[in-house]
Structures are given as structure tokens and as C-alpha cells.
């Protein structure tokens, strides 16, 4: 039977590449809050007690490699971009953990796993790029074991930016919503032990945290690839220039939050 290919958000051919296309091409991943936020999410999801961990939207694979090295568990890493997965596999080989990570191309709204599979699921900077947040969360719950944890790290609007800035937001997350909207979505899930830790962004600290998480070994070559695209690829050149020209004041309207929930245990059969 033919396997249904996940819907891709990545463009091809002569169409101007998107923010995510550029990230995949040069091999870079951005998560709000950097190392500190991601490490806090791992703690909240009790990865030290997990045997099977899923990371959705693994990007270049920093998270899966770190989890595989730090925790005694098996990691499954999925991304909708095969280019991102290629970077992630390369990092796993460099870190010596490729045997402990399974990589799959998949869409967060159509995960190719059976019900009740994972002890913990980590999702960072994924739902900001999709409209179907409720459907994605239902799918995450489906593949989580009863008693397992789901942790999200997603950006939100502290307040919606003015129209002259809002147009730039499509480059950094076309599905960004307000904190109040996020609280409504998370509040009606069937998850237990729901918490939301909201944080404001500080631009300089954000840069430092991202460098600490990704590492100079990945960042410097990535900037070299950005320069190459600027010099050789007209379609990429326009997209990169647009992203580099995003007004810095847009950050003043943004925050990020760590969302935690636990799937209820199944009731004992009577």
C-alpha cells in the first residue's frame, strides 16, 4: 500500500524560498530561549525517567543528540524537512549517538506512530508555523503513553505588533498567536498537570543562549553557507535580505512559553 507523503511546508523550484527553507539549506535551528529554555523543558518532562522520547521538529538535531548523550533513553526525531534530517543525522554521527536515535520524515499533524508510544514528547518552535495547533496537540497526545509528558516551547505575541511590523512576522512564524489564545488552547486539552511558564525576550540574551545551545562549530559554517547563497542564488538572496532586514523592535512584542502537560493514566478495567 502506498504511504501517504506528509504535506511539506518547504518550497521547491523557482519559488522564492521561505524562512524555513533557508534554515534547512544552511543548517541552522532557532528555538526561543536557547539552551536554558530547552534544558528546563527536559527537566519538566522528566526525561531522566523516560525510555522512549520523541522530538518533533528536530531541525539540525541539536536536541536529539543532547538527549541521547545525557539521558538513558531511546530517541525518535522527526522533521518535515529531509534537508533538516540530513543535518541531524550528521550531528548524531559527530556526537557518537547515531545508534541511539531513529530519524523519520513526518508532519506533526500526521505522526507515523501507534497510539501510546512515547514516555515524553518535546516540541520546540513548530506550532508557531502552523494554523492547526489543536489538531497537532491531539496528535501529540495520541502517541504519548498514559502518564507520559508533552512539553512545548513556542513563541507568542505579548501584544499584536502594529501593521507595519506584522508583515515581517510571516518570516519568523506565520502561526504566532497571543499568550491569551495559547492559554485557551492549552487549557481545554485533556492533559493533567498543565502548566505554562511565560517569558519575555531580551535580544542580546537570546543571541547568547542560541550560541550556547547550537555551538560555534555549527554557527560559523552556517554563516558561510548564508554568504554563498547571497552570492550565488538570486531566489535565496531576496529571502535572506528580507529576513536580515526584520526590524529589531519586533522582538519587543514577542515572548515565549514552556507548556507542560501529562496524559491521564487509563482507568483500570472493572
Where are these regions (language model features)?
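Short, glycine-/aromatic-enriched active-site segment of Class I SAM-dependent methyltransferases
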Residues: 155-174
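A short acidic, Gly/Pro-enriched loop at the edge of an enzyme's catalytic core
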Residues: 109-120
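Short alpha-helix
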Residues: 175-190
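Conserved alpha-helix/loop element of class I SAM-dependent methyltransferases that forms part
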Residues: 31-49
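N-terminal, positively charged/glycine-rich alpha-helical extensions of SAM-dependent methyltransferases
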Residues: 1-22
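Conserved Class I S-adenosyl-L-methionine
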Residues: 197-270
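Class I SAM-dependent methyltransferase SAM/SAH-binding core
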Residues: 54, 60-110
Amino acid at each position: 500500500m502506498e504511504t501517504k507523503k506528509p504535506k511539506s511546508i518547504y518550497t521547491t523550484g523557482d519559488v522564492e524560498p521561505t524562512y524555513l527553507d533557508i534554515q534547512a539549506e544552511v543548517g541552522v535551528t532557532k528555538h526561543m530561549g536557547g539552551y536554558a529554555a530547552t534544558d528546563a523543558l527536559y527537566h519538566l518532562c522528566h526525561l531522566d525517567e523516560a525510555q522512549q522520547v520523541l522530538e518533533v521538529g528536530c531541525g539540525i538535531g541539536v536536541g536529539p543528540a543532547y538527549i541521547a548523550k545525557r539521558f538513558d533513553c531511546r530517541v525518535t526525531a522527526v522533521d518535515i524537512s529531509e534537508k533538516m534530517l540530513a543535518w541531524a543525522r550528521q550531528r548524531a554521527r559527530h556526537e557518537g549517538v547515531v545508534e541511539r536515535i531513529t530519524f523519520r520524515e513526518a508532519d506533526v499533524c500526521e505522526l507515523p506512530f501507534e497510539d501510546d508510544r512515547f514516555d515524553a514528547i518535546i516540541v520546540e518552535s513548530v506550532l508557531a508555523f502552523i494554523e492547526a495547533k489543536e489538531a497537532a496537540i491531539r496528535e501529540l497526545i495520541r502517541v504519548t503513553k498514559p502518564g507520559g509528558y508533552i512539553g512545548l516551547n513556542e513563541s507568542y505575541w505579548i501584544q499584536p505588533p502594529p501593521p507595519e511590523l506584522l508583515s515581517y512576522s510571516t518570516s519568523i512564524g506565520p502561526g504566532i498567536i497571543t499568550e491569551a489564545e495559547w492559554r485557551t488552547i492549552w487549557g481545554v486539552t485533556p492533559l493533567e498537570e498543565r502548566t505554562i511558564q511565560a517569558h519575555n525576550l531580551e535580544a542580546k540574551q537570546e543571541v547568547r543562549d542560541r550560541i550556547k545551545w547550537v555551538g560555534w562549530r555549527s554557527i560559523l559554517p552556517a554563516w558561510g553557507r548564508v554568504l554563498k547563497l547571497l552570492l550565488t542564488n538570486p531566489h535565496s538572496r531576496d529571502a535572506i535580505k528580507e529576513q536580515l532586514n526584520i526590524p529589531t523592535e519586533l522582538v519587543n512584542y514577542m515572548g515565549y512559553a514552556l507548556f507542560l502537560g501529562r496524559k491521564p493514566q487509563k482507568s483500570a478495567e472493572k
